[in-house]
Amino acid sequence: MTQFNIPVTMSSSLSIILVILVSLRTALSELCNPQDKQALLQIKKDLGNPTTLSSWLPTTDCCNRTWLGVLCDTDTQTYRVNNLDLSGHNLPKPYPIPSSLANLPYLNFLYIGGINNLVGPIPPAIAKLTQLHYLYITHTNVSGAIPDFLSQIKTLVTLDFSYNALSGTLPPSISSLPNLVGITFDGNRISGAIPDSYGSFSKLFTSMTISRNRLTGKIPPTFANLNLAFVDLSRNMLQGDASVLFGSDKNTQKIHLAKNSLDFDLEKVGLSKNLNGLDLRNNRIYGTLPQGLTQLKFLHSLNVSFNNLCGEIPQGGNLQRFDVSAYANNKCLCGSPLPACT
């Protein structure tokens, strides 16, 4: 039988061609946009190549769900990276938020959280993410002020900057965002007054959490225009009247104003029938408890302790289900579950 001996040089050439063909086939079958992949690899580098991002490999497809925290748009089959979760990474040393995030122009959702070694301000590059709906930067050491340039991202629905090292004052400009539904800025070092413009958020806006900061001054009268389902301004240094947050014509479910220096007549406020949580402890609130509290069938959380309230606790509804601690240390509040009035 005749045997054919392929020369070594030809064999090597065939091997090289085979490798090229395999690589070409892989490249052609890859769904990940090459610009998105390059941006992700740069983000990884900018964060010091943490071991938790070891799945981000240049030889694999970033849209095959093996890249930790990366999702691509499969609905429209554009396969652009539209969802990025950068949470819980152990950075080898302090790094800022990568400006290379701006090179992911189709991002809809960005979560950056639980990274102690993430420092510095929120970079202006974020403003280039013009399709961003949900922005979360939480539980980091990111510092500086909440930037005005966020108002350029008209698509924003949710802003959550909770538990960072942010300081400065609240940016008035974000109230112009037409699609914003809620802000969560609790657990920072934000100071100064709440801007009057925060009473002019769109009708879509229903949630405001700015607790555990250093806010001063009064709650703007413009807040009467808001219809908030949830508001938490607790643990600040706010003063004056908070009655603008209440109203029988509103859909308010929770109001948390504890540990401020608020001073208003509680008896005169209107109550939303949907109210299920009310925390007013440690203020200077006076008057009597409104009779309307007995009509709130969803009320399951109440604390009005450490105020200047007087009179008898109304009987009925859920009011007697709360223990003494919910009513304690007022000026002259009495009746069940407190001692009887005399």
Swiss-Prot record:
The record's Gene Ontology biological-process terms are:
defense response
Q: Which domain of life is it from?
A: Eukaryota
Disulphides: C32-C62, C63-C72, C310-C332, C334-C341
Question: Where exactly are the transmembrane stretches of this chain?
Answer: none
Q: Any one cellular component term from GO for this entry? A: extracellular region
Q: Check the UniProt entry and state the signal peptide residues, or none.
A: 1-29
* Recorded topology in the membrane: Peripheral membrane protein
Question: Where would I find glycosylation on this chain?
Answer: N64, N141, N303
Q: Where in the cell is it found?
A: Secreted, Cell wall; Membrane
- Give the Gene3D superfamilies listed for this entry: Ribonuclease Inhibitor
- Which UniProt keywords are given for this protein, alphabetically ordered? Cell wall, Disulfide bond, Glycoprotein, Leucine-rich repeat, Membrane, Plant defense, Repeat, Secreted, Signal
The record's account of tissue expression is:
Found in suspension-cultured cells and to a lesser extent in hypocotyls, leaves and flowers.
What is the first-listed, main subcellular location in coarse terms?
A: secreted
Q: Where does the record place its LRR repeats?
A: 82-107, 108-132, 133-156, 157-180, 181-205, 206-228, 229-252, 253-275, 276-299, 300-319
Under Pfam families, the record lists: LRR_1, LRRNT_2
Q: Which family does it belong to?
A: Belongs to the polygalacturonase-inhibiting protein family.
Q: What does this protein do?
A: Inhibitor of fungal polygalacturonase. It is an important factor for plant resistance to phytopathogenic fungi.
- What name does this protein carry? Polygalacturonase inhibitor 3
Q: Which organism is it from?
A: Phaseolus vulgaris (Kidney bean)
